[in-house]
């Protein structure tokens, strides 16, 4: 899909076959819970150390912390990856930093349409790189930086996990495409 406009590339990918998007089975509506970010820890040392251990470049980690995209939670010292609706937080995915206990989960009330993205400004680049997780997106930015490419101009979008049963276009990708088309 190189050298195609974003709408043409999406159309080509969608027409290439694969599983058809279908209406999911009707689920009972759950009461909406309000979204609130977990309290912040005084520093981000454990998050920084954990992500460095995963090979993420320190400049990229600091960029995310500085812009409010990432911080360390106070209670469990999790990485908190934040997604924004305009200038307000609307989504957060937590990833545990402890090596002996694996933890991954969305913060209650998160709106998946606004999942973690760096920087996700459609006008900056004609390319959108889509990843399942925030750490995958940060790894990609690290690879761009290592190769001397413009990581600060790359549009990266994390889908915040993708379920096997969910055959709909992920909400964050759908929102992004509507903004670009």
Language model: regions and residue ranges:
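Short Cys/His-based metal-binding microdomains
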Residues: 1-7
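Small-residue helix-packing motif on alpha-helices
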Residues: 9-10, 61
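Basic, glycine-enriched DNA-binding surface that flanks or lies within the catalytic cores of DNA
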Residues: 15-113, 119-121
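C-terminal domain-closing interface element
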Residues: 51, 180-181
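Phosphate-handling DNA/RNA-contact segment within nucleic-acid enzymes
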Residues: 74-176
